[in-house]
């Protein structure tokens, strides 16, 4: 006898995503903050030393980069460092988010919120565990999320656009 496949509805998928994003934020914020202040020191230690900032006081460091003096410092040929600093902070955040999703998807076939809601991600055709390539595609296709999530409403398998792109589907386990 064939096992019946149940596809989670739109609200359940949205709720699951909201839980995951809350959890990722909880994890990512301290990591991002740690990286932010360490990279800030690495890139701009000459500025902090020149204005005698207490580098152990993150508020002081942050306030100093919001000042007119820092703006003048950037205009003196340090703007490229500032751009690179921001790119690295962005990359750090993406890496943390990517690590959470792809690691859970790959090793557990689900995320913590989907596990709690008894859902899992499978290959849309075979219903087996998706390949790493599919999971990476799925993550990269999350860029379509704000619009792509509405595809669930019109799909018999309740697939969002990122599911279709990756060839995956979310089912109740």
Curated annotation (Swiss-Prot):
Signal peptide stretch: none
Keywords for this protein: Cell membrane, Membrane, Transmembrane, Transmembrane helix
Subcellular location(s) of the protein: Cell membrane
Recorded coiled-coil stretches: none
GO CC list: plasma membrane
InterPro entries reported in the protein's UniProt record: Pra-immunoreactive, RDD
Protein name: Uncharacterized protein RP437
Topology of the protein relative to the lipid bilayer: Multi-pass membrane protein
Record-annotated membrane-spanning stretches: 24-44, 82-102, 135-155
Source organism: Rickettsia prowazekii (strain Madrid E)
Chief location bin: membrane
């Amino acid at each position: 006898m064939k096992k019946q496949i149940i596809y989670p509805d739109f609200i359940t998928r949205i709720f699951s995503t909201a839980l995951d994003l809350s959890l990722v934020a909880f994890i990512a914020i301290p990591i991002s903050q740690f990286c932010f202040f360490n990279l800030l020191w690495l890139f701009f230690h000459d500025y902090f030393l020149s204005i005698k900032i207490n580098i152990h006081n993150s508020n002081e460091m942050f306030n100093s980069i919001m000042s007119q003096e820092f703006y003048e410092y950037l205009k003196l040929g340090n703007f490229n460092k500032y751009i690179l600093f921001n790119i690295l902070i962005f990359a750090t955040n993406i890496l943390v988010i990517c690590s959470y999703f792809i690691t859970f998807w790959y090793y557990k076939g689900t995320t913590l919120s989907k596990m709690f809601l008894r859902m899992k991600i499978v290959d849309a055709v075979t219903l087996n565990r998706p390949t790493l390539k599919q999971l990476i595609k799925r993550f990269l296709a999350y860029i379509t999320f704000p619009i792509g999530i509405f595809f669930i409403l019109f799909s018999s398998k309740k697939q969002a656009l990122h599911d279709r792109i990756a060839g995956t589907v979310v089912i109740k386990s």
